[in-house]
Amino acid sequence: MNYKHPNLFVMIPYEERNRVSGYFDLSVVGEEYAKLLGDLTDELSTYAVSKNDVGENAVIIPILRAGMSMSNRLTKRLPKADVARISMRRNLHTLKPFVAWDEFEQIKEPESKRVFITDPALATAGSILKTLEHMKKYGFKDENVVIMAMFGCQSGIERIFKEHPEVKLFLVHMADGIREDGYLLPYNGDTGDRLYGVRENESWIVKLSATGYQRRLQR
């Protein structure tokens, strides 16, 4: 994985993937998985946040649900930062993300705020791009944005920098690529589902995705 960009920072090199093997172990779920993501967030924050930064004039924006696994730890690193959540859902027909609700109105002077967006898996980048698009409506500035993720693939990263070249992106590790169904390679499942369980009205999407992918493999 030799992709480079001046605003991309990758913490763990490809040859040290064994350090994040638990991320791909689908038997690691719930509190155990939350701790794994939290510990990696602590480590990543040493790269993304300066030593004496306590979060003055900053806001942490977790993309629900999975982003909370990172923001819960980041708030301890940046205790003075505000937190404004954004909830993404999938259109049940197109499977594309849309904003269900957000807490951005509570943020005063958003144009001057430093922003930390948390979302563990950066695959197609659809949720992050939709978040950045939505933030602009409130006055947030790309040059003040730091995106923090566990894993990301080149195609999703390129989409972000093409549309938002001024943001900074901090990754724990680069993924190999992306599957046809939009999940990362190596496959790590749905982070929100591994943490909190499958949403009732989306369980059919998970089954359809898994079945469809298996059929493609058998061709």
Kindly give the residue locations of the regions a language model identified.
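PRPP-associated nucleotide enzymes
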Residues: 1-219
